[in-house]
Amino acid sequence: MISFVQLVVQIREIFQQKLIDVDEVMKLMASYKSNANEWRRFAIFDMNKYTRNLVDVGNGKYNLMILCWGPGMASSVHDHTDAHCFVKILDGELTETKYAWPRKRHVPLDISENKTYGMNGVSYMNDELGLHRMENLSHSNGAVSLHLYIPPYSTCNAFDERTGKKTQCTVTFYSKYGKKVDYRGSKNGN
């Protein structure tokens, strides 16, 4: 069994290679058994929205972050702007709903898969598989998830589930390395 620090180090080692094996990354993410004492300092909640908390920038090759989900919180339906997305549940449960890419304008998105992941569950998503939304369906418990994005990205597209309408969004970090970010006066949110 590996620690959270060892997981971060081993992810960094994988990304020193020229070719990245998705299955190897999935196995590594699955090999870590969540221990809140190891990652708690990065898990910063906000009662009004889910938060993206940066853990490691991986020499510009990836972003590793912890997302914190209050009861009932959800992401928008979104793409990953050609990035690979690995998710590991560190605490609680998250439901992932996958959607097919919109084929027509002003038509509801088609759900292709709906799956709930409990603690230590691992998921993978990329744009070839479609769009997705992550949500904490619990009305009383929070959830925490570890996300690895390869390559890192600063924008994505959000989609209206009812119409398929696409809107470009800038993604920001609520905290970096365990410290809340103050964006007052910042134009890019990074």
From Swiss-Prot:
Disulfide bonds: none annotated. Keywords: Dioxygenase, Iron, Metal-binding, Oxidoreductase, Thioether bond. It comes from the Eukaryota. The thioether cross-link between Cys-85 and Tyr-149 plays a structural role through stabilizing the Fe(2+) ion, and prevents the production of highly damaging free hydroxyl radicals by holding the oxygen radical via hydroxyl hydrogen. Pathway: Organosulfur biosynthesis; taurine biosynthesis; hypotaurine from L-cysteine: step 1/2. One of its GO terms (biological process) is taurine biosynthetic process. Its EC number is 1.13.11.20. GO terms for molecular function: cysteine dioxygenase activity; ferrous iron binding. There is a cross-link at residues 85-149 (3'-(S-cysteinyl)-tyrosine (Cys-Tyr)). Fe cation binds at residues 78, 80, 132. It holds the Pfam family CDO_I. Its cofactor is Fe cation. Binds 1 Fe cation per subunit. It catalyses: L-cysteine + O2 = 3-sulfino-L-alanine + H(+). Coiled coil: none annotated. Belongs to the cysteine dioxygenase family. This is Cysteine dioxygenase 1.
